[in-house]
Each structure stands twice: as C-alpha cells, then as structure tokens.
Swiss-Prot record:
Gene3D superfamilies: 1.10.287.70, Cytochrome c oxidase, subunit III, four-helix bundle. Component of the cytochrome c oxidase (complex IV, CIV), a multisubunit enzyme composed of a catalytic core of 3 subunits and several supernumerary subunits. The complex exists as a monomer or a dimer and forms supercomplexes (SCs) in the inner mitochondrial membrane with ubiquinol-cytochrome c oxidoreductase (cytochrome b-c1 complex, complex III, CIII). This is Cytochrome c oxidase subunit 3. Component of the cytochrome c oxidase, the last enzyme in the mitochondrial electron transport chain which drives oxidative phosphorylation. The respiratory chain contains 3 multisubunit complexes succinate dehydrogenase (complex II, CII), ubiquinol-cytochrome c oxidoreductase (cytochrome b-c1 complex, complex III, CIII) and cytochrome c oxidase (complex IV, CIV), that cooperate to transfer electrons derived from NADH and succinate to molecular oxygen, creating an electrochemical gradient over the inner membrane that drives transmembrane transport and the ATP synthase. Its main location: mitochondrion. InterPro entries: Cyt_c/ubiquinol_Oxase_su3, Cyt_c_oxase_su3_dom, Cyt_c_oxidase-like_su3, Cyt_c_oxidase_su3-like_sf, Cyt_c_oxidase_su3_a-hlx.
Amino acid sequence: MNTQLSRTQFQFQPFHLVTPSPWPLLTSFALLILTSAAVMYFNGYANPLGGSGALLVGIGLATTVAAMALWFRDVVAEGTFLGDHTILVQKGITMGVALFIISEVFFFISVFWAFFHSSLSPTVELGAQWPPVGIATINPFELPLLNTILLLSSGATVTYAHHSVIEGNRRGAILGTLMTLIFAVLFTICQGIEYLNAGFTIADGVFGSTFFFSTGFHGVHVIIGTLFIAVAFFRMLSYHLTDHHHLGFEASILYWHFVDVVWLFLFISVYWWGS
C-alpha cells in the first residue's frame, strides 16, 4: 500500500500531459466572431447586433485577446511555477516554434511569388510595364527606409536583451526589451501613416492588392511579435526569467528576427525594385 501511494507522487515520463482546458475552444469561437465580423464589415453588411459594423469587430478582437491572455496565463503557470516544462518539453516547444516559422516562410514565398509573377511579366492590361500605368508609387527612401532602420534597430536591441538575460544583466535585459518595444510601436505607427498617405488602394489592380497584402500581412506579424515580446517583458519585470530558463523570450526573439528578414525582402523587392 505504501509503495502504491509513493508511486503516485512521481512522474515516470518527461512529457507534459496537458490538463483539459477551455481556452483553445473559446479562442476558436472568438476568432470565428472576429473573422466573420471583419468580412461583414469590409463588405458593408449591417451589424446584426445593431450599431456600427466596427462594434462587432471590436467585440471579436476583445474576446480573442481575453481568451488568449487567459490561455497564456495557464501556460506561464505550468512552465514557471509548476515545473511542467522539462528539458524535453522545452526541446519540443523549440521545434514547434521552428516548424511554425518555416511554415510562415513558405507562406511569404507564395506572397513574393504572386508579386514577381505580375511584375516580371506585366500584362497588356497593366500597360505592359511595372508599376502599372497610373500608379503613383511610394518613395522607398522616405518612410520605408525609416521603417527599415527602426526594424533593424529593434533586432539589435532584442539581441542585446537576450545576451543580457544570459549574462544575468537584468538592467540591460529590461532596457533592451523596452527599446525593442518602442521601435516596434514606432514601426507600426509609420506603417499606418504610410497607408493613409498612399496614392493607391488595395483595389487598384494587382499592384495595390499585392502591395497591401504583403506589407499588411507583415504588419500583422509585427503586431503579433510586439505582443509576444511585451509578454516576455512583463514576465521579465516579474522575475519569471532566469539565465537558463527563458524559453518564451527566446521564441519571441526567433519570431522577431524572422519578421526582420521578411521586411528586408519586402523593402528591396516591393518598395525599391518594385517602384
């Protein structure tokens, strides 16, 4: 009897068996509300709840953020306070992040494929030239160049923060991460200003659609990466990270460097060569 009782106190495998959680299902419903509301809003359909169509989009966004925040709270508790993230679990998470980034790479390859398919062999409908006739392109050496400087600077500061965490330099880690967040927010603001002042829209043929889809989807990745790093920043302030256990921060850094590299390709091909 005593032997059976003692065995229940130990885990005989290194994997983390996740307990039942409502957050994946609730996040799925929240995303369904958000995407459905966005489609209705973009196509001018009335809000079934009354009021502006943007209201339903806001509700979907708020519920999505709330569900994900509660989900991430449980993940942080499991990894930081309960010790469920063993070395093998951390290796699995790292592999999962790497595979996710690889899938994102192939997605952006398809975006660049669409761009070069249209730009390298423009049809007669486009005036047999690129940019198409009537399109006033954005000067790549104004806001796009500033955004490039901001994003590359953020890559440098987040790398500095990473090395500071490894070396136990708490002040340097906090400063580097804070500067990264500032650069990221400035990038998003500049991107919004660029969109507002652009001389074309997403409806202006293949040029407008490929431009706004590629840069806009990258902008969404920047916002996601900013939130990812912001979570790591607040965990850093709460003393959750150590010099040997900061997997969430490392994952956010890998994601951010991926965003940096994609932007370089966008700047060179879409903004510079494409204009």
